[in-house]
Design a protein with these regions (language model features):
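Active-site-proximal loop/hinge segments that shape catalytic or ion-binding/gating pockets
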Residues: 1-132
Length: 132
């Protein structure tokens, strides 16, 4: 994430990464209405080992405390639990994006300039606390 990890070929850092925020339950409702499969993982979906779930009542299995903390270290599998992911098959409707978080004023301006003039324009905010 800081362009220095030996196992990653990406060296661009976090600045160009956008965070798209949406309401989890609205997305699930949309997916179910449109026969789109969805799932979430209890850890990083890109790892060799992960567990996934696909029922609303299983959301309680997520370690919400780990997900919400700004710390990546500590016991009880915090690092793994923090990497839980929500996945949706094929596509995601742009109109469900409620906010875009960016790292810097430069990226903020680039994103604002790229949003469609006549369409859905979710608010864009510099959210440094969303980055590490």
């Amino acid at each position: 994430y800081r362009a220095n990890h030996q196992e990653l070929t990406y060296r661009g850092g976090q600045d160009p990464i956008l965070h798209l925020e949406m309401d989890l339950y609205s997305v699930i409702a949309w997916a179910e209405e449109h026969n789109q499969r969805w799932a979430f993982t209890l850890s990083n979906a890109g790892s060799y080992y992960f567990e996934d779930r696909c029922k609303r009542e299983q959301l309680a299995e997520l370690n919400w405390e780990a997900i919400q903390t700004n710390q990546w270290s500590g016991g009880n599998g915090i690092k793994e639990a923090k990497q839980a992911e929500f996945l949706i098959e094929r596509n995601f409707p742009w109109h469900l994006v409620e906010r875009i978080g960016v790292h810097s004023p430069l990226i903020y301006q680039q994103v604002v300039n790229m949003l469609p003039q006549g369409g859905h324009r979710p608010p864009v905010e510099v959210k440094r606390e969303w980055y590490y």
